[in-house]
């Protein structure tokens, strides 16, 4: 069912894969399906862009989130997402998707068509989904890939999701739902689940026991 729902959006003429810089640099693009607009009044915005730049960067920010070292080398030079996704200044690495910085006027993109391509690809598997994966890669300036088996295909999809959705809140959930979090991040098994809130356990003892490890 996931691939059918994703394919229905891919077929919708209101949406299309767009140039990557337009997604985060222009309101006029056909790729974004759903996003929160940030208001201009002071104090009304969640200012997500403030989190990714240092105060010394021209965009200014609190620099609460920064890309891991391997992120800075995972993009091929011909990947059209590279300059929009990451940048470096004064030996500091930055996520570059939200350029309004401290002003916080960037929209918060929740869902866009590229995700539908990768959902469809993953749901269909190697035989049915490879074309969708490669269509997205070609749009982003990359060559087609030819994984030899389902495991390699899933790894290719997950890597593409990492490249496409850097700093958009997908990576942790991708690793957990595919059982790769402990291997990739070195987390313990119990950390892949949140604890049940003690308040809810108090009100509903039938929820006990808590998730393992808590």
PLM features per residue range, with description:
Residues 53-56:
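Mobile gating loops/cap/lid regions near enzyme active sites that modulate substrate access
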């Amino acid at each position: 069912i996931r691939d059918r729902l994703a394919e229905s959006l891919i077929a919708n003429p209101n949406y299309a894969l767009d140039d990557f810089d337009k997604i985060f640099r222009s309101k006029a693009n056909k790729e974004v399906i759903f996003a929160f607009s940030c208001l201009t009044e002071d104090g009304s915005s969640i200012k997500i862009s403030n989190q990714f730049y240092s105060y010394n960067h021209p965009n200014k920010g609190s620099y609460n989130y920064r890309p891991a070292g391997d992120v800075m080398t995972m993009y091929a030079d011909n990947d059209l997402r590279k300059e929009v996704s990451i940048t470096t200044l004064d030996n500091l690495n930055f996520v570059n998707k939200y350029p309004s910085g401290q002003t916080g006027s960037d929209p918060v993109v929740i869902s866009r068509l590229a995700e539908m391509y990768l959902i469809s690809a993953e749901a269909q598997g190697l035989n049915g989904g490879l074309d969708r994966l490669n269509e997205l890669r070609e749009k982003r300036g990359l060559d087609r890939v030819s994984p030899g088996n389902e495991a390699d295909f899933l790894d290719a999809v997950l890597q593409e999701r990492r490249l496409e959705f850097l700093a958009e809140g997908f990576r942790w959930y991708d690793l957990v739902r595919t059982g790769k979090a402990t291997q990739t991040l070195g987390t313990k098994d119990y950390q892949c689940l949140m604890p049940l809130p003690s308040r809810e356990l108090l009100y509903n003892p039938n929820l006990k026991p808590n998730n393992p490890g808590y």
